[in-house]
Amino acid sequence: MLRVAGRRLFSVSQRSSTATSFVLSRDHTLSDGGNSSSASRSVPSADLSSFNSYHRSVIRGFASQVITQGNEIGFGSEVPATVEAVKTPNSKIVYDDHNHERYPPGDPSKRAFAYFVLSGGRFVYASVLRLLVLKLIVSMSASKDVLALASLEVDLGSIEPGTTVTVKWRGKPVFIRRRTEDDIKLANSVDVGSLRDPQEDSVRVKNPEWLIVVGVCTHLGCIPLPNAGDYGGWFCPCHGSHYDISGRIRKGPAPYNLEVPTYSFLEENKLLIG
């Protein structure tokens, strides 16, 4: 548009100079022809008026042409110029691609390689994630050393009748008592209904001769003393809880009987705790 305006202005200046030279030459010719002074003055004034009208018409034509040119590219319409340029492209519209870097389209033959790389990366990622999950699960499971410590094998051949042996299992003391016939009769003669934590003696033992209980008081976790108390079983010196020969609470603040751990007899004189 600026180029068009420059051309119009240049053409107007040329026309103006041509008209001016024409009027001056006309005036000079008339004055040299020997006519009167009034005639020589009237001719240039008429020529000047015609020149002014011609000059105004040229300017009006230039303005109308500029407006028409503006309307052609969409400045005079309600639609924005950019939208109009997109709808009606022409050779006069030039786009500046300096700030818009254009990349050439990709080669279709390389798509297979790109898909292969992406798929392979996903499989590798899934494999690594699977290994991490498996390692986490394995680390959370107990090892063989821990499982070995979780169970304890005890030889019962050296325990005399009427005595109690204390072993350590999972950081806790375990009482193993070999009961006599009198101890068994005394444990079965108790009225279960009168107990704070009622349990039959047959429920607490697998072999009536052997009683296996965890040596921790159910009150506050103290270790009771064997072969002590008012009932011939265990006595807790911390707060005065009394347990009978079956490990049941008979007196004192303890709310429950002594805990019976999981155990089994491997052989006649072999005991496995845990």
Curated annotation (Swiss-Prot):
It catalyses: a quinol + 2 Fe(III)-[cytochrome c](out) = a quinone + 2 Fe(II)-[cytochrome c](out) + 2 H(+)(out). GO terms for cellular component: mitochondrial inner membrane; mitochondrial membrane; mitochondrion; plastid; respiratory chain complex III. Residues 1-62 form a transit peptide. Keywords: 2Fe-2S, Disulfide bond, Electron transport, Iron, Iron-sulfur, Membrane, Metal-binding, Mitochondrion, Mitochondrion inner membrane, Respiratory chain, Transit peptide, Translocase, Transmembrane, Transmembrane helix, Transport. It is a single-pass membrane protein. GO terms for molecular function: 2 iron, 2 sulfur cluster binding; metal ion binding; ubiquinol-cytochrome-c reductase activity. Its cofactor is [2Fe-2S] cluster. It is found in: Mitochondrion inner membrane. The Rieske protein is a high potential 2Fe-2S protein. This is Cytochrome b-c1 complex subunit Rieske-2, mitochondrial. It comes from Arabidopsis thaliana (Mouse-ear cress). The gene is UCR1-2.
